[in-house]
Amino acid sequence: MGNCNKPPKRPPNTQTSAAQPSAEFRRTALPSLYGRYNCKCCWFADTNLITCNDHYLCLRCHQTMLRNSELCHICWKPLPTSITVPVEPSAPPP
């Protein structure tokens, strides 16, 4: 009775949700036969790159794209939302 401001109860989602896309963060991109890698969006950044499907994005462009949508503006696939940072040695082995 009366006005109720509670949101309607929804049944639990029985579908399996797709895994969140994951990306690897690299301070410097792997060496290439065709020269250095750059961010495919701004073409300026060549360090601190994130792998997106078949290209690299810098952190700045990645965050800008995530603010606008969940899809990459270049390849139209889901943007990585979790970033894994590999352990890089700080010095060469003895």
Curated annotation (Swiss-Prot):
Quaternary state and interactors: Interacts with protein NP; this interaction probably directs the encapsidated genome to budding sites. Interacts (via RING domain) with polymerase L; this interaction inhibits viral transcription and replication, Z partially blocks the product exit tunnel for the releasing nascent RNA product. Interacts with the glycoprotein complex; this interaction plays a role in virion budding. Interacts with host eIF4E; this interaction results in eIF4E reduced affinity for its substrate, the 5'-m7 G cap structure.
GO cellular component: host cell perinuclear region of cytoplasm; host cell plasma membrane; membrane; virion component
Organism: Machupo virus (MACV)
Post-translational modification remark: Myristoylation is required for the role of RING finger protein Z in assembly and budding.
Top-level division of the source organism's lineage: Viruses
Main location, first listed in the record: virion
Domain notes: Late-budding domains (L domains) are short sequence motifs essential for viral particle budding. They recruit proteins of the host ESCRT machinery (Endosomal Sorting Complex Required for Transport) or ESCRT-associated proteins.
Similarity comment text for this entry: Belongs to the arenaviridae Z protein family.
Protein's membrane topology: Lipid-anchor
Record keywords, A-Z: Host cell membrane, Host cytoplasm, Host membrane, Host-virus interaction, Lipoprotein, Membrane, Metal-binding, Myristate, Viral budding, Viral budding via the host ESCRT complexes, Viral release from host cell, Virion, Zinc, Zinc-finger
Region feature Disordered, mapped onto this chain: 1-22
Pfam families in the cross-refs: zf-P11 (PF03854)
Record-linked HAMAP family: ARENA_Z
Zinc fingers classed as RING-type: ranges: 39-75
Lipidation (N-myristoyl glycine): 2
Its job: Plays a crucial role in virion assembly and budding. Expressed late in the virus life cycle, it acts as an inhibitor of viral transcription and RNA synthesis by interacting with the viral polymerase L. Presumably recruits the NP encapsidated genome to cellular membranes at budding sites via direct interaction with NP. Plays critical roles in the final steps of viral release by interacting with host TSG101, a member of the vacuolar protein-sorting pathway and using other cellular host proteins involved in vesicle formation pathway.
Name the record gives this protein: RING finger protein Z
Gene Ontology BP terms: viral budding from plasma membrane; viral budding via host ESCRT complex
UniProt xrefs under InterPro entries: RING_finger_Z_arenaviridae, Z_RING-type_Znf_sf, Z_RING_Znf
Motif PTAP/PSAP motif per record, residues: 89-92
GO MF assignments: RNA binding; zinc ion binding
UniProt-annotated location(s): Virion; Host cytoplasm, Host perinuclear region; Host cell membrane
